[in-house]
Regions:
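Active-site scaffold of zinc-dependent metalloenzymes
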Residues: 66-147, 158
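Conserved aromatic-histidine-acidic binding/catalytic patches
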Residues: 30-33, 37, 117-126, 175-187, ...
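Metalloprotease/metallohydrolase-associated module, dominated by Zn2+-dependent proteases
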Residues: 165-238
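Zn2+-dependent metallopeptidase catalytic core
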Residues: 12-65, 71-73, 77-89, 134
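Pan-zinc metallopeptidase signature
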Residues: 5-6, 209-382
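Short, glycine/acidic-rich hinge or "gate" loops at secondary-structure transitions
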Residues: 51-55, 146-159, 202-217
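Hydrophobic/aromatic-lined pockets within catalytic cores
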Residues: 135-143, 191-201, 244-245
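Post-HEXXH active-site segment of zinc metalloproteases
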Residues: 124, 140-186
Length: 382
């Protein structure tokens, strides 16, 4: 997009969102952040996301205050929130839907903090986490809820599917079952990274709005290639990194998560995975996420062995998919470089089990540096 068109788009959305900012008493900083988020989504998804974005920003309040999200949530009687987060979405399912399918969801609120724990969050990190949460809400705009029967309520947000079952004996009056939670987080993390880098690329243009230009100048990255890396690069993201680099897959996810045809994504994955179904693949990713916290916390050899076993299985699936999707030894080798990071990571998990803490953490730091190196190679080779 040329300089004239970008400035026109930024100015239009900035003026459009001024009314919403006044309604919720947003600061100038937050107004600029939602303007940049709006423009990034607009450039990614086109005009079809224009009305949904405005509707979301007009109805979903962003609570941006001093402190971390847990402190802010408690101040607003939203209950305790996960530690270590910069932003979270507060959501309460509307159980009246079991009796009246025309009911709407309760309004959501996005909580954005200035700190991660006790540490000050950088401008780039705050923008990333705000876009991450807004994208979750946007991907659920056309897929908010479906009352299947009087006892079953289905809700989808992106690739995250949840079934709520009416249970009058339970304290919350319902039970739930989810699928695709981790896969949704992985794709959301990666696409959010692309959006943040899109915004940071605006530095190459002459931005006429002084407030927006000054804010964009505060967005920094320590990466050698000057590209911002999302904070969510944990084990499951590294495992799927070769798949995330596949433009056909990412474009399909980006469009289908928004427009609602999740079956196209399921078919794409199942057509390229011979040995497992889509649901089984999603369940393994969820297990990796759950077990990664368990083995470090509980020092349980069984948890670690299961963790490594599932990682090896998923690694095999990704190799299988690469052979089908890429069909080129050059590309397969390129993406294997990224995949090998996860293999090194799992091999060195045993340092923890043997109590060699120093060696364990040195290994993790080495793997992180290796990941950055390979990510740079991938970018240079494209």
């Amino acid at each position: 997009m040329n300089n004239i068109k970008l400035n026109k788009l930024l100015n239009e959305k900035y003026m459009l969102l001024k009314g919403i900012a006044k309604k919720f008493n947003y600061s100038d900083e937050l107004l600029i952040m939602i303007t940049l988020a709006y423009v990034a989504f607009y450039m990614s998804l086109g005009k079809d996301c224009d009305v949904p974005l405005y509707d979301l920003f007009n109805n979903v309040q962003i609570i941006y205050e001093e402190g971390n999200v847990n402190e802010i949530a408690i101040r607003h009687d939203l209950g305790p929130m996960p530690q270590g987060s910069v932003a979270v979405t507060a959501f309460i399912p509307n159980l009246k839907l079991f009796k009246d399918a025309t009911q709407k969801q309760y309004p959501q609120a996005i909580i954005l903090g200035t700190h991660v724990g006790d540490d000050l969050a950088t401008p780039a990190l705050k923008l990333e986490m705000l876009i991450h949460e807004v994208r979750h809400a946007l991907m659920g705009y056309y897929n908010s809820h479906l009352l299947i029967d009087e006892n079953t309520y289905y809700m989808r947000r992106g690739l995250h599917e949840t079934y709520y079952f009416r249970d009058d004996n339970a304290k919350e009056k319902f039970s739930s079952k989810s699928n695709g939670t981790t896969l949704d987080e992985i794709t959301n993390t990666y696409i959010t990274e692309l959006l943040v880098n899109k915004i940071m690329s605006f530095k190459e243009n002459l931005i006429k709005n002084n407030k927006i230009r000054l804010y964009i100048d505060t967005l920094k990255t320590a990466q050698a290639d000057k590209r911002y890396r999302a904070i969510g690069y944990n084990t499951e993201v590294r495992l799927l990194y070769p798949l995330l680099l596949n433009e056909e897959f990412i474009n399909l996810v980006n469009k289908c998560q928004f427009y609602g045809n999740i079956n196209l994504i399921k078919e794409f994955l199942e057509n390229n995975i011979d040995s497992y179904t889509y649901d089984e693949f999603c369940q393994m990713l969820d297990q990796i996420f759950e077990l990664e916290g368990k083995y470090a916390k509980n020092n349980n050899p069984k948890d670690t062995e299961e963790f490594v076993r599932i990682i090896k299985t998923v690694k095999g699936i990704i190799i299988e998919m690469n052979k089908k999707l890429l069909g080129s030894s050059r590309n397969l080798l390129k993406d294997w470089a990224n995949l090998s990071i996860s293999l090194e990571y799992t091999r060195n998990i045993y340092f923890y089990m043997n109590g060699i803490w120093t060696e364990y953490f040195e290994t993790l730091i080495g793997v992180y540096k290796e990941f950055r190196f390979f990510a740079k190679l991938v970018n240079l080779s494209q």
